Amino acid sequence: ILYNKDTDVVILPEMWNNGYALEQLEEKADFDLERSTDFIKNLALQYQVDIIAGSVSNKHHDHIFNTAFAIDKTGKVINQYDKMHLVPMLDEPAFLTAGKNVPETFKLSNGVKVTQMICYDLRFPELLRYPARSGATIAFYVAQWPSARLNHWQVLLKARAIENNMYVIGCNGCGYDGKTQYAGHSVAINPNGEIIQELSTTEKELTVTIDIDAVEQQRKAIPVFDSLVPHLYK
C-alpha cells in the first residue's frame, strides 16, 4: 500500500511496536514517542503519505500510556491521543495510565478532517460525538480486538458510523499472541453504516477510496446533530 502513489493516508493497528505484552511494557515501551515517531516520519517522507500510526506503548514522566499518533507527509506530528478507556478485563489499569483528553479533530494533508481512537474506546459512543460535531468526517479506530468478540467489533463500528453520519475505519490486529487470537476484519464503513470493504482474519492490506461529499449529504438527510439536546442528557 505504501508504494501506491495515489494513497493519501495509511493506517496501522494498536500496539504495533511491541505487541500486547503488558507485563513487558516497563522494559519495551518507547520514551516520549522518540523511536516510534522517527520510524514513522521516515516512512511518511519516503513515500509522501500521511500515516495514522496506530498506537504504541509510550513512557512519559514515569507513566506508560497507550498512545496513538499521526504524522503527515512532511514528517510533522499532526495529532497525538492517549487511550482514555483502559480494559478492566485485561488488567490494563495495572500496567497503563489512562489519558485525560478527548480525541481531537485534525486535518490530513488533503484537508480532510478526521479523528482517531483506540480499541476499547469503541464501546463508548459519547467519545466520538465531540470530534464528529466539530467537523470530523472520518473516524479511525486502531485495535487489537479479540476473535471472541468479533461480533461486537463489527456491530459497534457500524453503529458509530450511523450515529454520526461519517466514515469509520477499523484497523485491527490478527493472528495469535499467546493464547489470544485477534479478530482481524479490518474494515471501512460508509456514513450509512454499509461496509465498503473488509478483510478476513489473515494479514493483508486494504485499499479504499472514500467520497467525502457523502458525509455532508448524509448529515443533511439525517441532521442528528441539530436534534441533540445535551442539557437533558445529564
UniProtKB/Swiss-Prot annotation:
Q: Which Pfam families match?
A: CN_hydrolase
PROSITE patterns annotated for this entry?
CN_HYDROLASE, UPF0012
**PANTHER family named in the record:** DEAMINATED GLUTATHIONE AMIDASE, NITRILASE-RELATED
Quote the protein name from its UniProt record. Answer: Hydrolase in agr operon
InterPro entries, sorted: C-N_Hydrolase, C-N_Hydrolase_sf, UPF0012_CS
List the cysteine pairs that form cystine.
Answer: none
Q: Where is the CN hydrolase domain?
A: 1-212
Q: Which family does it belong to?
A: Belongs to the carbon-nitrogen hydrolase superfamily. NIT1/NIT2 family.
UniProt-annotated catalytic positions: E14, K83, C119
Source organism (scientific name): Staphylococcus lugdunensis
